[in-house]
Amino acid sequence: MKGLENLGLENIGQVFHNLSYDELLKHEKNNNEGVCTKNGTFSVDTGIFTGRSPKDKYFVKQDPSQKYIAWGKINQAISEELFEKLLVKAKKQLSNSDIYIQDAYCGASLKSRKAVRFVTQIAWQAHFVKNMFIRPKEEELSGFKPDFVVYNACKCVNEDYEKDGLNSEVFVIFNIEKNIAVIGGTWYGGEMKKGIFSMMNYWLPLENKLPMHCSANVGEKGDVALFFGLSGTGKTTLSTDPKRRLIGDDEHGWDDEGVFNFEGGCYAKCINLDPQSEPEIYGAIKQNALLENVVLKDDLSVDFNNGSKTENTRVSYPIEHILNHEPSLSAGHPSNIIFLSADAFGVLPPVSKLSKEQAMYYFLSGYTAKVAGTERGITEPVATFSACFGEVFLPLHPTVYAKLLGEKISKHNVNVYLVNTGWSGGAYGVGKRMSIKATRACINAILDGSIQNCEFENYDLFNLAVPKELAGVESKLLNPINTWEDKKAYEETKLKLAKMFIENFKRYEDVKEGAEFKLAGPAI
């Protein structure tokens, strides 16, 4: 293959370059990398790491990128010297062996996409890359020039990590100036997916384009909707709609031409997967898909309800496995943006219409609430705030992304809504989870535009515009005060959540945008 000498590897055995799905399956079987399930889907275990290792992620601190990066717990700095040392170690691991090289694009927009080359010793990791990124056409492969190279030396660990001042023997390092990432010590496939997402979150804003952690779909009339939300808020479920084509389920960009998927596949959670409630995802698990960390029954079928290896069981598959997908992986500018929050305190309305300033506030807040682990006997919900609904993937300051979103909302006259997929009638333990039927009715009213004709009332403290009536939703559900029996507990809980929002937003007080958008939040 062309460009092999540029990789800096020595005494390479065979190079398996851009293998087909059938070839990859053959290698996976021959290498004993996993098991073929009853229906022909290959299944692998990712070892001790069944999720990402955010504490082991670093950026090389150097010019010019160091002046743009928001350094801290999320974006940790590493020296050029230490990067070079670990890169040499990783290259040594990848040398003197057979290697798999997979070339792919990140970004469906020809103007915005990046060409990425992945180098690994493991066939299933090449398979994962083939599923998750955009597969180049035959003619594109012949002249493929990578913008970025990922060395995945998952078999290699850094025994000197304590001496080096690092968190563990695992390392995931990005050198922006050299256009290289190096991974060591973890086999988890999601490091490659989210690693390149982090890089897109660095590159695109510098070109005045917005990278987003959201799902997207498009209606028959070409109207585009974006769904932002943290894990467990219903992003994948609600954007998978038989009446609308799926653009993508997780990572998108928004440039002057519209919205485009970064990926060519989906990475869905499998735990408790039910063919009745999520038939599209269930149907996508077939040959060419790749299962991770699932438990198999004696007949080699998947036990989706078994989380004994991890709750984070996953499947990656090419987006073509979803019948109702948008083949171009792109569409025009959004008509509607929906922020999903699973509010376990039970005080956010099922649906609220946001002003542009409120959109900035709730985007920067990135709120959801998780239900605490029952093993400690705790029934109190835990508030989670993750800027832009994906803070762990943002190399730049969150206000950079918020500012870009605000400009695009104004320019394209986009409607923005906050939808609570969490609790109603009381907090977790007292109230009930919002039914999917009621949430779908709220989403449908947003997408068909009928919510625009509603009469709205002000939801005090949060100052949110809430519809008085909405087709398909019981009217008393629309304002949380009507659903709580204990009005005193309601007022106390509402105030408590408002204070949490205010406390979290103090982190933005040192920047101009923070002081400006703060006024759109709860007012005590």
From Swiss-Prot:
GO biological process: gluconeogenesis
Keywords, comma-separated and alphabetical: ATP-binding, Cytoplasm, Decarboxylase, Gluconeogenesis, Lyase, Manganese, Metal-binding, Nucleotide-binding
Keyword tRNA processing listed: no
UniProt protein name: Phosphoenolpyruvate carboxykinase (ATP)
Taxonomic source organism: Campylobacter lari (strain RM2100 / D67 / ATCC BAA-1060)
Annotated residues for binding of ATP: 194, 213, 229-237, 278, 314, 439
Catalysed reactions listed for this entry: oxaloacetate + ATP = phosphoenolpyruvate + ADP + CO2
Cofactor: Mn(2+)
Gene3D superfamilies recorded: 3.90.228.20, Phosphoenolpyruvate Carboxykinase, domain 1, Phosphoenolpyruvate Carboxykinase, domain 2
Function, in words: Involved in the gluconeogenesis. Catalyzes the conversion of oxaloacetate (OAA) to phosphoenolpyruvate (PEP) through direct phosphoryl transfer between the nucleoside triphosphate and OAA.
Listed pathway(s): Carbohydrate biosynthesis; gluconeogenesis
UniProt cofactor note: Binds 1 Mn(2+) ion per subunit.
